[in-house]
Amino acid sequence: MAFTTRRRVEFRDTDAAGIAHFSAFFFWMESVEHELLRAAGIAVVDRDGDGQEVSWPRVSASCDYTSAVRFGDEMEIVAGIASIGRTSLTYGFRFTHEGRPVAEGLIVAVRCLMHPGRKPQPVAIPTELLDRLAPYRLPDAPAGPA
């Protein structure tokens, strides 16, 4: 089962031609990612069992565009877990407007211990979190973790 939500193209999301600016899709993907995590009962920033801060920095993001949307258009966004690695999640996103494909994107996020002033340290995704994410696996997603 994928996660489905909606977003309306706001004036701030458009370019001089009144079309949704490419960068807005990255904001929408991150926003929907956070919404999916909340639906799964997972905090974006949390503490592990030892009280250390844990979060999900993005290490890759991409988006391919197939048609334009404009100010006021409402899109349906379908998101889900495309693949799971030992420390990473790959989210897939599909944007449509009135049934017409608009864009598809991917975000790769890595579960990390966050140490102020130091590089984030990747850590394994706990089984409990994998279980919470299971309902959001995309139908054609590999079984993982890799």
List the predicted regions and their residue ranges.
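Terminal targeting signals and extreme-terminal segments of soluble enzymes
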Residues: 1-76, 82-146
